[in-house]
Amino acid sequence: MKLKLDLHTHVWEAFNFVPPSVAIAEKVVAQIKSMGIDGIGITDHHNKEWGMEFRELVEKHFPGQVHILPGWEIEIRPEANPFAEYQVAELFLPDGGGVFRTYCHPGYYSPEILIEPDIHAIEIDNYIHNWHIRKDQVAEIASEHDLMLMEGSDAHNLENIGLRYTEVELDDLYARAVPQA
């Protein structure tokens, strides 16, 4: 079954970097439902623990209502060209499913797009960074490297969660993911 997932959000930042709480979870679950999507990936910068704690909290207090995939967004400096730095959203799939990696907002920071091993997807649409994504080039790169094309909100506030999403089978994420280190 395909799910509508916004796999690029910054919920910790949206709530001013406070610890996860039932009140925050209630607001996020309500936003997810109001946008007609099935779930989100939490990809705050350099903090995977917040998303993991948040997922546990949602599962405890709102079981079965939405999908939460914890992760983080990190910078990558390719060995081939350290000046072609880019950002990757790593999602830590539940139940030992491994790590699913998406190349975020291609063209930001560097206009050069280098695809390294263990990149599984690339954003073709990003609500806040769309202005520099060269969609034709991204589609071609995705085809060349067998990458999934993703759309994400890159929400840094509650109201933007779900403004972009990708319809995807969870099994497809699991099939491409690499084992967690």
List each model region and its residues:
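Short, electropositive alpha-helical surface patch
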Residues: 55-63, 67
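Divalent metal-dependent hydrolysis catalytic cores, especially in the metallo-beta-lactamase
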Residues: 28-46
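A short, structured active-site edge motif that brings together acidic residues
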Residues: 67-79
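Short, well-ordered coil/turn segments that N-cap beta-strands
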Residues: 1-3, 36-39, 64-68, 99, ...
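Charged catalytic cores and adjacent phosphate/nucleic-acid-binding surfaces used
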Residues: 1-7, 11-21, 30, 52, ...
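Short His-Asn-centered micro-motif
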Residues: 43-45, 104-106, 153
